[in-house]
């Protein structure tokens, strides 16, 4: 099977304490690895101010994951759970061409 490189960027609520944020990141990293993805990098980008209010917040913590996957099983599960998680304000999954 051919491996495809993806990048996931998601925005975490700024009012989460460090322990809750770490648990959230570890949980979503585990969702990907449990479904066959290989994480290359998972790191906080920065806390950034929004151009407009999202979910009652004016800023959020951006987190970026770079990964390799042979299928979309892990990505679909990540997408499904990120949509229903109140701590993730927005997320985006893109296929990298490099």
From Swiss-Prot:
Segment forming the signal sequence: none
GO biological process, one term: translation
GO cellular component: cytoplasm; ribonucleoprotein complex; ribosome
GO molecular function, one term: small ribosomal subunit rRNA binding
Pfam families: Ribosomal_S6
Classification via CDD domains: bS6
Record's keyword terms, sorted: Ribonucleoprotein, Ribosomal protein, RNA-binding, rRNA-binding
InterPro entries: Ribosomal_bS6, Ribosomal_bS6_sf, Ribosomal_S6_plastid/chlpt, Transl_elong_EF1B/ribsomal_bS6
NCBIfam families: S6
Function: Binds together with bS18 to 16S ribosomal RNA.
Family statement drawn from the similarity comment of this UniProt entry: Belongs to the bacterial ribosomal protein bS6 family.
Protein name: Small ribosomal subunit protein bS6
Organism: Levilactobacillus brevis (strain ATCC 367 / BCRC 12310 / CIP 105137 / JCM 1170 / LMG 11437 / NCIMB 947 / NCTC 947)
Source taxonomy: Bacteria, Bacillati, Bacillota, Bacilli, Lactobacillales
């Amino acid at each position: 099977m051919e491996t495809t490189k993806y990048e996931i960027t998601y925005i975490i609520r700024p009012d989460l304490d460090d322990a809750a944020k770490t648990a959230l990141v570890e949980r979503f990293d585990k969702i990907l690895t449990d479904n066959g993805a290989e994480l290359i990098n998972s790191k906080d980008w920065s806390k950034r101010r929004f151009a407009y209010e999202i979910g009652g917040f004016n800023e959020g913590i951006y987190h970026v994951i770079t990964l390799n996957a042979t299928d979309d099983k892990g990505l679909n599960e990540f997408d499904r759970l990120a949509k229903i998680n109140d701590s993730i304000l927005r997320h985006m999954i893109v296929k990298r061409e490099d």
